[in-house]
């Protein structure tokens, strides 16, 4: 139609300066994260609606589109946070928001979905992060399954930001993780041989491939872009 729905993350940290009434700015502790759903009329070029659809969240950094709605990722572990939330795009309230704990608790950055099998691919914004996927047991129950971390075949704890040769193709495998409510998934994965990435960022699924980038990866720490082919496991 003529209307576009934009799901806008609130990437705001826990402590921010806020205007307190008519007085001076002061530091106030609150939960300023979340998601706002905006409806834009392309033809008339005006904002039709703007409402918050996720509240009580913190530092919603990136996320990704999915068959079920917008997936919003928290990039913080403060106060028990660090989850992915499902925000339906067809609702203008917070009633149907869902925490996806099976996607793990970590410094989440972004996520994408392979619509062929509903596998989720997730990045983590840390200097010593892993690259993750969530494998549903069955396709129509996308949030029930197992969490895994990517490993390079034949390489234990491969350091991608200094050893990766862009001219080569690497065969990969996945190690299973014990998905508890702790910020230790990367340590679990690397103990089992998972590859190490430097500040995982955006992810996108296109033409049956997963593309993702790292902010400070590479020999000069100016970033890397990776392509993963699920069909070939490389």
Language model regions located:
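Sequence/structural signature of beta-propeller domains
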Residues: 1-234
């Amino acid at each position: 139609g003529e209307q576009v729905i934009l799901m806008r993350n609130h990437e705001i940290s826990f402590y921010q300066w806020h205007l307190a009434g008519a007085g001076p700015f002061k530091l106030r502790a609150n939960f300023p994260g979340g998601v706002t759903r905006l409806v834009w009329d392309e033809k008339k070029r005006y904002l039709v609606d703007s409402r918050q659809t996720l509240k009580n969240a913190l530092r919603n950094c990136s996320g990704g589109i999915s068959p079920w709605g917008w997936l919003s990722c928290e990039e913080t572990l403060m106060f028990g946070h660090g989850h992915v939330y499902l925000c339906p795009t067809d609702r203008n309230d917070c009633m149907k928001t869902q925490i996806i704990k099976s996607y793990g608790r970590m410094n989440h950055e972004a996520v994408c979905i392979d619509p062929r099998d509903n596998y989720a691919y997730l990045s983590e914004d840390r200097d010593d992060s892993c690259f993750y996927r969530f494998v549903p047991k069955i396709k129509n129950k996308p949030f029930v399954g197992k969490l895994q971390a990517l490993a390079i075949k034949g390489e234990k704890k491969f350091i991608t930001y200094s050893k990766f040769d862009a001219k080569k193709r690497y065969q990969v495998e996945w190690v299973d993780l014990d998905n508890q409510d702790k910020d230790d998934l990367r340590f679990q994965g690397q103990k089992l041989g998972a590859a190490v990435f430097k500040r995982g960022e955006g992810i996108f699924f296109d033409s049956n491939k997963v593309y993702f980038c790292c902010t400070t990866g590479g020999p000069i720490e100016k970033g890397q872009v990776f392509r993963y082919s699920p069909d070939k496991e490389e």
